[in-house]
Amino acid sequence: MAIQQLEPEKRNKTIHVINTDTLVESPIVAKWVGKSLAKMQETANEENLPIVTHRLTPAVDNTFWVNLRGRGYPFPRKKLRWCTDRLKIKPVNDFIKNKIAEHGEIILVLGTRKAESAQRAITMAKYEKKRVRELLSPNPTLANELVFSPLENWTNDDVWFFLMQYKNP
């Protein structure tokens, strides 16, 4: 929405919209995400928006079934969440590292919110202290990446109000 309001000559930075497919989502969810990314890309093209969508997946040796069945890892649980890093974080970090190598630096926009959980609020508060500008923090694990969290103070009601008020492209 904000990008649509910019004059076309000011839309000079490519915006990469990423989704990480763990390859263990239900077929209904996977299909919906695929259609959403395709529709988002189609709308971006029609409206001349500098948006490129990406569906990221883990490397074969990091997939759920290779690790669970092939390597004998225990089923993930709260205290042993081996899958989060391999299925979600690593594909995203690899993508980001490639973009940093290409452009020198990036800004990652995340929809994380303090209201998601008590642990999320604690983690976000920790990074708040290191901010370089309002809602903009350095990533502690990747150099040359800033993290922008515009929704950090949104409540669950704020999210639902927004989703009901604005049509998804």
Residue spans of the language-model regions?
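Nucleotide-activated chemistry modules centered on ATP-dependent adenylation/adenylyltransferase
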Residues: M1-P169
